[in-house]
């Protein structure tokens, strides 16, 4: 039984899942929206929301925390340029997931996750 086991495993090991989340977060910050599977979009959404909440206040500590999650200085700089101005007065709800329908090859449910 999976009682009290939070989060989705996505059929990957811990390291692979962590790298997947990091890459999805970097791509989302750089491109403002990405097309991925619905399961991946739902899994990475809370991570991105927490990262943007950290980036709302531009302090050295917040930058270090964001860099530890992103591991990309360019993405971190970009996040800290738009997050305080865009999301300064908003408490959560920074992303939107839109369903796109099944993928042609394998029928996986696709989704568009974007920064609002």
Curated annotation (Swiss-Prot):
<keyword id="KW-0689">Ribosomal protein</keyword>
<comment type="similarity">
    <text>Belongs to the bacterial ribosomal protein bL17 family.</text>
</comment>
<dbReference type="GO" id="GO:0003735">
    <property type="term" value="F:structural constituent of ribosome"/>
</dbReference>
<dbReference type="GO" id="GO:0022625">
    <property type="term" value="C:cytosolic large ribosomal subunit"/>
</dbReference>
<protein>
    <recommendedName>
        <fullName>Large ribosomal subunit protein bL17</fullName>
    </recommendedName>
</protein>
<dbReference type="Pfam" id="PF01196">
    <property type="entry name" value="Ribosomal_L17"/>
</dbReference>
<dbReference type="GO" id="GO:0006412">
    <property type="term" value="P:translation"/>
</dbReference>
<dbReference type="InterPro" id="IPR036373">
    <property type="entry name" value="Ribosomal_bL17_sf"/>
</dbReference>
<keyword id="KW-0687">Ribonucleoprotein</keyword>
<dbReference type="InterPro" id="IPR000456">
    <property type="entry name" value="Ribosomal_bL17"/>
</dbReference>
<comment type="subunit">
    <text>Part of the 50S ribosomal subunit. Contacts protein L32.</text>
</comment>
